[in-house]
Amino acid sequence: MTTFQTAPVTLPTPLGGSLVRRIWRPGQDFDPAELAGRPRLELSSRSLADLEMIATGAYSPLTGFVGEADYLSIIEHLRLADGTPWSLPITLPVTAEQAAGLSGRVVLTHGGEPVGTLDIEEKYAAQKSLEAREVYRTEEEAHPGVAALYAQGDVYLAGPVTLFEVPRGEFPRAHRTPAEVREVIEARGWRSTVAFQTRNPIHRAHEYLQKVALELVDGLLLHPLVGQTKGDDVPAETRMEAYEVLLRGYYPQERTLLSVYPAAMRYAGPREAIVHALSRRNYGATHFIVGRDHAGVGSYYGTYDAQEIFNTYTAEELGIRILKFEHTFYCQSCGQLVSPRTCPHDSSHHLVLSGTKVREKLRAGENLPPEFTRPEVAEVLRKAYTR
């Protein structure tokens, strides 16, 4: 009888060659208890999220907040100074007054509690107008990313960081580091994994994209962003409940992993799509879905700009395959979910609900049509909006 040996799972190499780990462990060159006399710096929610993403290796190869050479190279060339693909400047802003009083090893705090350290190697001036134009493609403060940029300090601190403990937050069972996600993928024997980024509840069009992709690969990493978002986005706790009921009823459990992505949204559209893809490579994904207006807001970016920007790099540089999908919707004449590639009917036949329209219906206590979202998801959302 012929026997077949199962080949071991080979996960993609993290960006930069190895997974960064900047989480404090006993035996390191310092003990957190010995830092009582060091200067302190309170982090915003976004900077705390950046600290975690750096320290756990999600933002490999970054080992800290970027210095000026990397900052300018990212802005102007979508690469680190050494040529590695990277599209968002991960910086630590402070005021000029704060910067003047900080040097050496600084204790980073959040809510007054120590969460990590920064070894300051560099202080430099933020070039906000340039950053806004190149990263967000606008200087309008109506853009939430630009508004945040202009509101923060004018000096950036750079240097390696250490995180004392991974903040598991509201969803400890689903809060996994890149190393932990990689362990799950290996344990399940997935040789190919597609990651799906979302900051919204999953509607039928998203489900369609995920399941089309799941026909091509072994596993789906459903990776909702739970960091800071803008005020009118659906809260993370509501979204997580919606994801869980959807997965229980409509997805193969052994081929699906729900794990949170703790980054904050910057709404940088195409540039943010690149970091979303590269970081999912660090989590162990081999494929990444990019749909219409990925990480966009308002009308600042073209519908498929976030797909086209990946042409900036070679496939070898990216190290993760980008699955580009067109806009999908329910066609009443076709009687199913379709895209412009598969549907011959005009828009009068299509059921499309904007996020604004969905929120209006939910606040009014109205049901969402089953062609748009699963009834179980609609019920979770309806309850959340009518409490």
From Swiss-Prot:
It comes from the Bacteria. Keywords: ATP-binding, Nucleotide-binding, Nucleotidyltransferase, Transferase. It catalyses: sulfate + ATP + H(+) = adenosine 5'-phosphosulfate + diphosphate. It is an enzyme of class 2 (transferase). Pfam families: ATP-sulfurylase, PUA_2. GO terms for molecular function: ATP binding; sulfate adenylyltransferase (ATP) activity. GO terms for biological process: hydrogen sulfide biosynthetic process; sulfate assimilation. Its EC number is 2.7.7.4. CDD domains: ATPS. Pathway: Sulfur metabolism; hydrogen sulfide biosynthesis; sulfite from sulfate: step 1/3. PANTHER family: PTHR43509, SULFATE ADENYLYLTRANSFERASE. Belongs to the sulfate adenylyltransferase family. NCBIfam families: PRK04149.1 (NF003166), sopT (TIGR00339). This is Sulfate adenylyltransferase. The lineage of its organism: Bacteria, Thermotogati, Deinococcota, Deinococci, Deinococcales. The gene is sat.
